[in-house]
Amino acid sequence: MVMLKVENLSKKFKDLEVLKDISLEVNQGEVVAIIGPSGSGKSTLLRCLNQFEQITSGKVTICGDDMIVGQGKNEAIYASKQILKKIRLNVGMVFQNFNLFPHLSVLKNITEAPIRVLKKPKEQAQQEARELLKKVGLESKEKSYPCELSGGQQQRVSIARALALNPKIFFLMNQPPLWTQS
């Protein structure tokens, strides 16, 4: 089953074309790596797929929902806000610099979105967050703050935070986890 389909995606920043006619398909269960030198558009592609950047042209379908429904003069025409929200909930992303909330504990960083976005009860969100912390080997750090963690620990908290929203299809990462690089 196709979970992500990108057809002829292009992205321009004024006159600079960063992505040109990118097409790909990702099936359920597949792991895909986007590899290239600095400045080649990897992050821009991920940002476009996660709706952080406006696509100039092309078509994107995630879990059967079309993100792009037409083409305007200088940019793609997006689906309704309701469809885009549904799509966004299906995609998990760990940012390159992790983007943890510095004023929140590890546990609060992980539970904030499930409580606010998914409307989960606080106790359920905390229980699930603790299970995720155990999976990433940080069960003893739930009361710590991001500044008290190493870079690798911050990355694992960020992974747990993305997984806490139960993305259905795939997990976009801008860099491989630090623990896989040795």
Predicted regions and their residues:
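ABC family nucleotide-binding domain
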Residues: 2-182
